[in-house]
Regions:
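Short intrinsically disordered, low-complexity coil segments enriched in acidic
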Residues: 1-2, 18
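Structured catalytic-domain cores with a bias toward divalent-metal coordination
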Residues: 3-13, 25-256
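Bacterial N-terminal signal peptides
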Residues: 15-23
Length: 256
């Protein structure tokens, strides 16, 4: 028997892992309510995948310190079909190489550049480029699974507890609908004008962001916009679980 090199063995293991992930994502047509679980890695972070039935919809929880968003998504994916991504973290930033990064600031090379230098301004010659190249490679594999097809929705769930509110998004927004009875810290960002028209009639604050900014901060929303994906960010105050569950349900029931 010819011995298998270490490089070849790692290659085969990676191919097997990718095949397992793809089978989970696309191979659940037998039972609509079958729950499948696996994981994928991106930039040193582990994302647990939970799939319920067969749907193009994708959901993601990105910040480990936003636990209300996690609970809302766990509840939702048990009731509705789709594939949910849960980051395995308890903090906002995740460790990567010799620094930490915000996982919602590395969905473009420019964003990753600023994210890597935020907590570590000085890098040894050549090492920053190597780190960026590694994130680039992993990003493509991650997004191949995360991004839905043309009929699906991509929904990200976030919480705020530092004064962040809908008014801070006005500069990046093309259209705005603010409800007088709604707290400004509870709102929806969407990237599709037709979806915005429907959400205007909802009880929730909503902004439309369908033009790329001058400076790309690496957030998932801009990558979704570049790919013409129907993206939603459901943002609520930390601890307002019922609110976030209701907002998620509204999108599911009215925009599918």
């Amino acid at each position: 028997m010819v011995p298998i090199s270490r490089h070849r063995r790692l290659y085969l293991l990676n191919r097997l892992f990718l095949y397992t992930i793809i089978s989970i994502v696309y191979g659940s047509e037998i039972h609509d309510k079958q729950i499948n679980k696996s994981f994928i890695m991106f930039a040193g972070a582990k994302f647990n995948l939970v799939q319920n039935g067969d749907s193009p919809n994708r959901y993601i929880w990105l910040h480990g310190d936003e636990q209300t968003a996690r609970m809302a998504l766990e509840y939702h994916i048990g009731l509705y079909n789709g594939l949910a991504f849960f980051i395995e973290s308890e903090t906002r930033e995740i460790p990567f190489k010799s620094t930490i990064v915000d996982p919602n600031r590395i969905f473009s090379r420019d964003g990753a550049y600023y994210a890597l230098r935020k907590f570590k301004p000085g890098w040894q010659p050549g090492t920053l480029k190597m780190a960026l190249d590694e994130i680039d490679r992993e990003r493509e594999s991650f997004l191949d699974i995360l991004m839905p097809n043309k009929n699906g929705l991509l929904i990200s769930l976030h919480n705020n507890f530092r004064g962040y509110n809908v008014h801070k998004e006005k500069g990046n927004s093309q259209r705005i609908s603010i409800k007088k009875n709604e707290n400004p810290r509870d709102f929806i960002i969407c990237t599709n004008s037709s979806d915005f028209e429907i959400l205007v009639s909802s009880p929730y604050n909503v902004v439309l962001q369908n033009e790329l900014p001058e400076r790309d901060d690496g957030s998932l929303s801009w990558e979704a916009l570049r790919r013409n994906v129907r993206y939603f960010n459901i943002e609520t105050r930390l601890g307002y679980l019922s609110k976030q569950k209701a907002m998620l349900k509204y999108i599911e029931d009215n925009l599918n």
